[in-house]
Amino acid sequence: MRNLITIVGLLFVLQTNAQQVNYLNQGNATAKATVFAQGIISDGLINRDFTISPKGDEIFFTIQHKDFISSTIMHIQLKNGKWNEVQVAPFSGMYSDLEAQFSPDGKKIFFSSNRKVDAMDSINDYDMWYVEKTANDSWGKPVHLGFTVNSPHDEFYPSIAKSGNLYFTAQLDNGVGKEDIFMCEFKNGEYQSPVPVSTAVNSKGYEFNAFVDPDEQFILFTGYGRKDDMGKGDLYISKKNEKGEWQEAKNLGALINSKGLDYCPFVSWDKRTLFFSSNRNINAGPYEKPVTASVLKTQLSSPGNGLDDIYWIKFDELLKQF
């Protein structure tokens, strides 16, 4: 009996530890969407598209110039129990790179970049690339995903399922609307040609920046211009039914969406926390009394100033409501 109690207790401890992720020493998300890692990631600049490794020891996000002039992927790593300083990712810094996402096994990072495929490349578009983890715990050289996946047009926001299927944003001739979510099936070790995701997700308008559940049971994305749009683009969810078909997408609601643009969703690997980008302005007046110059300058240069920040919210219970 004592041995049984010991085993049960050990299993509980192991399960608890497995569920605990150190999100930059920020504690846990709450039922209200709040700025994530203020002063570390969200710092008053344009910070967007967050991802964390399956082991919870690496974070990537993007810093972007205004008007999408250029963007750079940033990197933070947990070593010896401590997070290091924010640095430019080892595979970024020269070109306009953004939207890094881990493969479910943590061995690859997929991202979008306008770097040229070779010296003969004359098309200035964004393609999808990947890097692989090296033996010394770094990242290798970027590899182009090839022209079955990539086109002469832009491809953005890769999201990879356990099956290997690749979801991304593009404007292709076989699309449904003005911008759509596409999927490339991974079959026999190769990516197949992109096909648009169901019209339960895609519309005649704009759908972009989709996160697919690694098990492909739900998908989150931004829709713009829909009848129930609360602002300049809202986050939506679609789940699969028992037949494996995507159901009609639903707006995630006012707990998450705002009057601004809400986009770039990422759900933690334990499916408890949603991270997303938003350019909502939470610092603007009106004020209860005249504001001082010092307070005004602080607000204008802090997260929530209308530039893009990373937000997070407790998601597991919310997910059950859809």
What is each residue range found by the language model?
Residues 1-21:
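Bacterial Sec-dependent N-terminal signal peptides
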Residues 19-322:
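Short, conserved micro-motifs composed of acidic
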